[in-house]
């Protein structure tokens, strides 16, 4: 089995996983194109957990692609938490990403960073949390973990 870091990567342990309850799963995927987001959406659709929440951040250079990416998760993700990729001057801000998610009829909220986003959405309810939209965002998550 081949595993590519940052592509449908299940986080089983570490600081980020420790912030969550035991029944919450954490997945990272650096999908930053329409095609790669379709693959992630297909994978998430197969998972038997109904409550799926996304943490989304992307670069400004992918702005046109961002709307197409979000569209692929309609009916899959119940909520989107938008974040600006830390220490990345070319990152879209969370406000604009939230507006984009709202235009696609997602429940959407902004967050300052990944840790803040996880605090906002972690509950005792069984769920899958997927951090996606940029390899930079996934890299940031991995460095924090």
Predicted regions and their residues:
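C-terminal helical cap/extension that packs against the catalytic core
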Residues: 21-27, 70-128
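Active-site-proximal loop/hinge segments that shape catalytic or ion-binding/gating pockets
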Residues: 134
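Short amphipathic alpha-helical segments
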Residues: 39-41, 67-68, 94-95, 142-145
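Short, active-site-adjacent cap segments at secondary-structure transitions
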Residues: 137-139
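Nucleotide phosphate-binding/pyrophosphate-handling subdomain across enzymes
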Residues: 1-79
């Amino acid at each position: 089995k081949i595993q590519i870091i940052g592509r449908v990567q299940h986080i089983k342990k570490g600081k980020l996983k420790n912030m969550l309850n035991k029944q919450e799963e954490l997945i990272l995927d650096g999908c930053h194109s329409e095609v790669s987001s379709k693959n992630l959406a297909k994978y998430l659709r197969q998972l038997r957990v109904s409550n799926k929440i996304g943490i989304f951040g992307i670069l400004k250079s992918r702005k046109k692609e961002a709307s197409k990416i979000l569209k692929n998760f309609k009916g899959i993700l119940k909520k989107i938490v938008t974040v600006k990729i830390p220490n990345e001057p070319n990152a879209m801000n969370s406000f604009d990403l939230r507006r984009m998610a709202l235009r696609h009829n997602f429940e959407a909220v902004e967050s300052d960073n990944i840790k803040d986003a996880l605090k906002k959405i972690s509950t005792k309810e069984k769920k899958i949390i997927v951090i996606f939209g940029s390899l930079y965002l996934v890299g940031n998550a991995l460095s924090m973990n």
